[in-house]
A protein has these predicted regions:
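NAD-dependent ADP-ribosyltransferases
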Residues: 1-220
C-alpha cells in the first residue's frame, strides 16, 4: 500500500473526496440487532479473529494483562463480561427502567460491528451497567458479522462545526482512523469476507475493492 503526503490543512478534503469516490449503494441489512463498538485501531484485529473475550485476547498475546488484573476482570460485578464473555448492545428497547442508563453504539469515533440476531448460544441480558447490554458467552466469530458501520463523515462534520476543534490532535485522529479503515478493507479483501462496510452518517456503502487500493495518508 502506497502513501500520499498531505499538508495538515488538506486532510479533511482528501478524506471526504476519497469516501465520495468510493461510495456505492447503501447495503440494507436485516437480522443484525446486536452492536459491538471498537476503536478504529483494533478493528482489523476484530475482522481477523472475531470479537474476543479477555481470556482469548491474552491467550493470543493481543493483550498482556497480569494475573492480578485478570483476577479483577473475572469479577463480573466490576466487569460484567468477565474473562469469558463479550459485551453487545441492542438499541430501541422500550422496557428499560427509569434509573437504567442506555448505551448508544452510534458514535463518530468508533467502528460498530453489527452482529447476527441468530448467534448461538443466545446472548443474555445484563443490566448491571447498561439496561440494553447483552453478554455473549464466548468469541463472536467474523461469520456472525452482518455489517461494519463507520461514521467518519460525522466526525468531520463535528470538526467543521467547531473550528476550534480542528487542531493537530483532531486531524491526526482523522488521519489515523482513515488509515485504519484502509487496513480493515485490506483484511476483508485478503480474507475474502463479504461483509458490507457502511458509512452510515453519509448513507452509503463503500466499494471495498476500490478504496482498499487508495494510499495511506502521511502528514507532511
Amino acid at each position: 500500500m502506497s502513501d500520499i503526503k498531505l499538508d495538515r490543512c488538506d486532510v479533511v478534503d482528501y478524506v471526504k473526496n476519497t469516501l465520495d469516490n468510493s461510495k456505492t449503494n447503501f447495503d440494507h441489512v436485516t437480522g443484525a440487532k446486536y452492536h459491538h463498538n471498537t476503536k478504529y485501531c483494533d478493528a482489523s484485529s476484530v475482522i481477523r479473529f472475531g470479537i474476543l473475550t479477555m481470556s482469548e485476547l491474552n491467550k493470543l498475546k493481543l493483550r498482556h494483562d497480569s494475573p492480578e488484573s485478570l483476577k479483577v476482570m473475572n469479577d463480573t460485578l466490576s466487569q460484567v463480561n468477565g474473562l469469558n464473555g463479550v459485551s453487545l448492545a441492542v438499541t430501541g428497547l422500550d422496557d428499560l427502567y427509569p434509573d437504567e442508563d442506555e448505551f448508544d453504539p452510534i458514535s463518530a469515533s468508533f467502528v460498530d460491528f453489527r452482529v447476527s440476531d441468530t448467534i448461538s448460544p443466545r446472548p443474555g441480558r445484563n443490566s448491571t451497567k447498561y439496561g440494553n447490554e447483552f453478554i455473549y458467552p464466548g468469541v463472536v466469530r467474523p461469520e456472525e458479522f452482518r455489517a461494519i458501520d463507520i461514521r467518519i463523515l460525522e466526525y468531520i462534520e463535528q470538526l467543521e462545526n467547531n473550528v476550534s476543534n480542528m487542531g493537530s490532535r483532531s486531524i491526526e485522529e482523522l488521519k489515523n482512523n482513515y488509515n485504519n479503515l484502509l487496513d480493515m478493507l485490506k483484511v476483508l479483501k485478503d480474507a475474502n469476507l463479504d461483509i458490507p462496510v457502511r458509512e452510515t452518517f453519509g448513507g452509503f456503502s463503500i466499494d471495498k475493492e476500490k478504496m482498499s487500493e487508495c494510499p495511506r495518508i502521511v502528514i507532511k
